[in-house]
Amino acid sequence: MSRVAKAAVGLMAATLVAKILGFGRELALASAYGASGVSDAFLVAMNIPAVIFTAIGTSLGTAFIPLYCEVNANKGEQSSNKFTNNVFNIVVIICLVLSAIGAIFTPQIVKMFAVGFEGETLSLAIYYTRVMILGLAFLGMSYIMMAYLQVKENFIIPGLMPVPYNILIITSIIISVKINPYLLPLLLLT
């Protein structure tokens, strides 16, 4: 089997495992919290950072690859690694600023995404989102690292990146339902 075929099979297997765990994550949430304010608040809080950063992260990754290749071709491996470090640092700083802004304006952001939420569900969604939006820096770092790995022709590890995240979410759901639902977003940041 050729190297490309092995990479394709590995990527398909990684994606399949990630999708199965994603399904398991949804089953765990439904089993633990059912159709409740906790599950609604958690789903909104998970989606807000994803929606905010997916477009930005995908754009960063798409722009990073050709720029890295250009720097690598013109100036060599050392310069391309320095370029990667600079991009990484800039993305982390931008994400930290976005996290701070998001934390300040969480109630307004949640109300845009969770139309109809009131009372305890709205309060929980705001709390969950405020905690989870602090993870934007990690999301930004993961997009740059995925692009870097793709440049280095490592496609399996980026395909596996959702696996530990889904395992962490499932574990957080199980622990939080036994102890306290307020732990749910905090456990995801550990």
Located regions from the model:
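Membrane-embedded alpha-helical bundles of multi-pass transporters/translocases
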Residues: 1-190
